[in-house]
Design a protein with these regions (language model features):
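Membrane-interface helix/loop boundary segments of multi-pass membrane proteins
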Residues: 146-171, 198-205
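Hydrophobic core of alpha-helical transmembrane segments in multi-pass integral membrane proteins
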Residues: 14-22, 55-65, 93-103, 235-254
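Interfacial transmembrane-helix boundary/kink motif in multi-pass membrane proteins
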Residues: 1-19, 45-49, 70-102, 161, ...
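Hydrophobic alpha-helical transmembrane segments
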Residues: 7-15, 52, 86-91, 133-137, ...
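Membrane-interface capping segments at transmembrane-helix boundaries
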Residues: 67-74, 248-262
Length: 262
């Protein structure tokens, strides 16, 4: 009976995120347009403030749910926040972004995926109406927090209750990828989910997967706003980070094996 409950949690949590986020978007839009009578053009220009508010509510809601679900696990061993693991998490995020860049370059050459790449690029450009501050607050800060609480803190942890760690990481990462609703984005989001899931499984500290996500989205944002000369340097940097990212992940896996054998 307990396993059935944990089996339902990932599905219900993802559905709740989908429904709540869409409901909040609808309510904010109606409040601004119908109650405050702000002109649509002005609303669109500053709509990122509404999105930031929505993400703040989502973070509060899902962090509360996360705490309620796992309040009995509060005493479990976890890695305290430290400079070495913070830096390692950022390196993993940068390296995943490097792999993502290679994947996108390949996808651009495949006729069957070109429309998906175009849709993904258009969606990225439309975040916060193209406003740099809004994009940073939404895509770089807020989205990593709420999505990691949801997919690592709730979905992955629930799956640990009825499936092996490797299967839980893989399935939760695929769900994370599919949730992006774009085949090109889903592929590298799944890869990022696996890396973030490994760090969370070994460290039991949500900050580390959040930092992986943060680093990945930060690079994506910088590439969208930086001039071409700077973009070339960013591309070289994230490609160089692939090897160190692999090292950090392998080290985490080895540390986990040593801990299990003790």
């Amino acid at each position: 009976m307990m396993k059935k409950r944990y089996f339902a949690i990932p599905i219900l949590a993802i559905a709740l995120h989908f429904l709540l986020s869409n409901l909040l978007y609808f309510l904010v839009e109606r409040l601004v347009l119908d109650v405050f009578h702000i002109p649509p053009q002005q609303f669109m220009k500053h709509s990122y403030w509404g999105e930031i508010l929505i993400y703040a509510v989502l973070i509060l809601a899902f962090f509360t749910l996360y705490k309620l679900l796992w309040r009995k696990d509060i005493s479990e061993p976890r890695t305290a926040t430290n400079f070495k693991d913070v830096l390692g998490s950022l390196v993993v995020g940068f390296g995943i972004c490097g792999i993502s860049g290679l994947w996108i370059m390949l996808a651009e050459q495949l006729p069957s995926l070109q429309k998906s790449v175009e849709a993904m690029n258009a969606g990225t450009e439309n975040i916060a109406g193209g406003n740099a501050f809004g994009t940073f607050m939404i895509a770089v800060i807020a989205a990593p927090i709420v999505e990691e609480i949801l997919f690592r803190g709730i979905v992955l942890r629930s799956m640990w209750k009825f499936a092996p760690a490797w299967a839980s990481i893989l399935i939760s990462s695929v769900l994370f990828g599919v949730y992006h609703l774009n085949i090109v984005q889903a592929a590298y989001a799944t890869l990022m989910g696996i890396a973030a899931g490994i760090l969370y499984e070994k460290k039991r500290n949500l900050l580390f997967p959040i930092l992986v996500h943060f680093a990945n989205n930060l690079i994506t944002m910088l590439q969208g706003f930086a001039p071409s000369e700077v973009n070339e340097l960013i591309s070289i940097f994230i490609l160089i980070m692939i090897a160190p990212a692999g090292y950090v992940i392998c080290r985490s896996l080895r540390q986990g094996k040593r801990a299990d054998s003790m």
